[in-house]
């Protein structure tokens, strides 16, 4: 009801002759009475809903008398209720010693209500409101006292669709974890000021790549050009939190719009203090409409990627945002919905454990052949990565295409090992795998009383030959899960291609020579580009088994990922990492799946309060590497070994070391959140450098719940 009813501009008078001043122009009914002003003396405010309505149980009258902002006593207010039977019921309510009004008349005439009037009987300001069957009547169309002041908000971890149009779920808010503004308040819906003569911005907790969304914002009483504010949206990882302009940012200030540039364009409408701004974003069309006080001002075009709302302040102005948790002031354009988890697109993978899962277990082997079956996975695993937590031991990587009883080690250059003397995997099951004590010991997989973690991926149901590239590959791929395993034999030639079967360009690729001792070649598309090579983008090379920084153009080993292939095999000795003639190789390739996997980068700041990294889901497994340093490890963290924050129990992919708890060492850790992760202090996670990451979800943000 409260989103569709509006006030009329009908009967309104005031004995002081200043019709429309602050005291004479109350246009909101609200329960938070301390925020509102009302009628002076005989001023009358009339409310007419778009259509008549009936009251099934109770009509409540709310009010408060004030005098210059302080409570007055023994003041009265007259309320009139008009019905379809043409009858009028009038009620006069008097408070006592400045108390709030709270009356529930039950003797109005039969018939549906067509109008309500409020008349002030004293020369004192009155704060007033009606509540019908427990629902507050609100004027969503006025700006001086508006929905921004409503403190009863719709926000719940339970997603549901409501007949009223105000769906249930977690609503977007400003994100204090990705903000240069330090005074965010009002439930993270008010930006707070920058506190200095310089731009500072704050992003939001939700980002979208598809769909149609609407949100509003109110400028404050000091929102002037010299005391600046910014209102806009930007790419999910903004280049700067102290600059509201530039690539990947679209915004509005005063009477200028900015589209990915610091040079703006003037528009016909000037927004100042106490104005209502709104955006109607259509990611499917790549457009966004900007409204000021419900008038269309500008349409942004050419929007792509994943974007999130942001606000900015230069010195003192603030903006109060409303993503739908409060009633909107205006009706959103057709098809546009609030930024609420219920309204987000349904994820391809609703539960991350159906594509990636983690098991921890304790070994039980003490002699050769002792085995145990680990169960409880949500699928039959195709790729298993096992590490002993309690002791120093090599990593154990095995897959069903290479052969599950054969393994590689992420921390070494060694090739295939069959039935490893330090333990191996003998088989997989519909929900797990069997680990065996080896000829020497079981330290890699099943040594008595040792603790282990196993990370498991699902690569689909079948393996087939793939001839998309110049070298034939044997591929097992799940396009739904964005993961494939491929084996091939090198031919020693330059500029070769490998089919990966993903149907989308991979962002993260591991290649290892199975026949001889060679480094692990790693392609990560956020590690930095080196121009073009043989018609494709060349990326810096990384090594999984080493703590080296990213390699330069002399290591042209793996590059140019496309929807069907990647290129390999050009360069000096590094060519042997991916294409030595006659050697057998395995390739693991991932492409991002929205709500399930993410591969990106962040810039560390070497502070105790590091960057927030948006993933669009609650991470379950995170791999991080500082690519600028030659002495920083590949860090693995997960939510199975760390069941609550802080998340600081680490294993290093490039070393054999036992698990270490960095959370207990100078507070070096991350916090796992419902929409990403927050990096904290120091090395190896937050140096002043570029860090790349690979991340897999427990649940997408739509269902991850606020944490």
Per-range role (PLM):
Residues 1-2, 6, 11-13, 55, ...:
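Extracellular low-complexity Ser/Thr/Asn/Gly-rich intrinsically disordered segments
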Residues 1-50, 67-73, 95-96, 174-179, ...:
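Disordered, acidic Ser/Thr/Pro-rich linker "stalks" and the adjacent N-terminal cap
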Residues 7-12, 45-49, 59-61, 79-81, ...:
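Hydrophobic beta-strand residues in large extracellular and virion-surface proteins
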Residues 10, 15, 57-62, 116, ...:
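Generic beta-strand hydrophobic packing signal
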Residues 23-89, 102-138:
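Aromatic, loop-rich ligand-recognition surfaces of beta-strand-rich domains
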Residues 87-89, 96, 296:
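Residue-level detector of beta-propeller blades
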Residues 94-115, 120-122, 369-376, 609-613:
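Beta-sandwich interaction modules
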Residues 138-212, 218-224, 236-707:
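Surface-exposed molecular-recognition determinants
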């Amino acid at each position: 009801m409260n989103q569709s009813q509006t006030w009329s501009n009908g009967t309104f008078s005031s004995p002081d002759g200043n019709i429309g001043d602050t005291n004479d122009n109350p246009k909101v009914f609200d329960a938070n009475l301390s925020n509102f002003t009302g009628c002076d003396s005989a001023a009358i405010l009339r409310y007419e809903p778009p259509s008549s309505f009936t009251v099934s149980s109770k009509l409540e009258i709310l009010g408060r008398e004030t005098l210059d902002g302080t409570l007055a006593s023994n003041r009265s207010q007259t309320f009139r209720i008009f019905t379809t039977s043409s009858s009028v019921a009038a009620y006069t309510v008097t408070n006592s010693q400045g108390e709030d009004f709270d009356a529930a008349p039950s003797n109005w005439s039969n018939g549906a209500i067509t109008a309500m009037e409020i008349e002030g009987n004293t020369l004192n300001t009155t704060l007033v409101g009606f509540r019908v069957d427990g629902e507050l009547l609100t004027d969503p169309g006025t700006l001086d006292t508006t929905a921004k002041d409503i403190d009863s908000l719709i926000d719940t971890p339970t997603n549901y669709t409501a007949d009223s149009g105000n769906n249930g779920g977690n609503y977007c808010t400003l994100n204090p974890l990705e903000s240069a503004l330090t005074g965010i308040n009002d439930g993270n819906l008010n930006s707070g000021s920058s506190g200095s003569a310089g731009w500072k911005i704050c992003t939001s907790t939700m980002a979208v790549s598809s769909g149609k969304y609407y949100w509003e914002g109110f400028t404050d009483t000091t929102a002037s050009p010299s005391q600046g504010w910014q209102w806009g949206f930007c790419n999910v990882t903004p280049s700067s939190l102290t600059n509201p302009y530039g690539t990947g940012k679209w915004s509005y200030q005063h009477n200028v719009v900015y589209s990915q540039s610091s040079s703006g364009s003037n528009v016909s409408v000037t927004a100042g203090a106490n104005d209502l701004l709104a955006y109607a974003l259509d990611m499917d069309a790549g457009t966004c409409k900007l409204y000021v006080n419900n008038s269309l001002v500008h349409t942004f075009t050419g929007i792509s990627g994943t974007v999130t709302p942001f606000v900015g302040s230069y010195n003192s102005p603030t903006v109060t945002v409303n993503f739908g948790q409060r009633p909107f002031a205006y009706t959103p354009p057709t098809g546009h919905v609030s930024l609420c988890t219920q309204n987000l697109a349904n994820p391809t993978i609703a539960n991350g454990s159906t594509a990636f899962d983690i098991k921890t277990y304790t070994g039980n082997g003490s002699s050769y052949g002792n085995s145990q079956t680990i169960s409880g996975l949500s699928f039959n695993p195709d790729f298993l990565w096992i590490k002993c937590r309690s002791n120093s031991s090599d990593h154990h990587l095995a897959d069903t295409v290479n052969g599950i009883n054969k393994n590689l080690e992420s921390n070494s250059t060694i090739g295939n090992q069959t039935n490893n003397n330090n333990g191996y995997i003998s088989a997989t099951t519909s929900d797990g795998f069997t680990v065996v004590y080896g000829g020497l010991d079981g330290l890699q997989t099943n040594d008595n009383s040792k603790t282990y973690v196993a990370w498991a991926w699902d690569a689909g149901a079948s393996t087939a030959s793939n001839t998309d590239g110049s070298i034939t590959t044997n591929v097992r791929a799940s396009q739904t899960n964005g993961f494939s395993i491929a084996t091939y034999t090198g031919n020693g030639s330059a500029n070769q291609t490998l089919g990966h079967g993903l149907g989308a360009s991979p962002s993260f690729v591991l290649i290892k020579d199975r026949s001889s001792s060679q480094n692990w070649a790693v392609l990560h598309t956020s590690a930095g580009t080196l121009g073009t090579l043989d018609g494709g983008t060349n990326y810096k090379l990384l090594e999984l088994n080493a703590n080296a920084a990213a390699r330069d153009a002399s290591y042209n080993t793996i590059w140019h990922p496309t929807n069907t292939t990647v290129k390999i095999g050009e360069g000096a000795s590094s060519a042997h990492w991916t294409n030595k003639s006659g050697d057998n190789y395995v390739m693991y390739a991932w492409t991002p799946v929205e709500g399930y996997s993410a591969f990106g980068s962040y810039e560390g700041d070497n502070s105790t309060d590091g960057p927030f990294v948006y993933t669009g889901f609650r991470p379950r497994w995170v791999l991080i590497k500082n690519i600028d340093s030659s002495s920083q490890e590949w860090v693995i963290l997960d939510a199975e070994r760390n069941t609550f924050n802080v998340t600081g129990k680490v294993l290093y992919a490039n070393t054999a070391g036992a698990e270490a708890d960095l959370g207990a060492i100078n507070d070096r850790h991350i916090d796992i959140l419902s929409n990403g992760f927050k990096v904290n202090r120091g090395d190896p996670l937050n140096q002043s450098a570029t860090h790349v990451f690979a991340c897999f979800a427990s649940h997408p943000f739509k269902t991850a719940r606020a944490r």
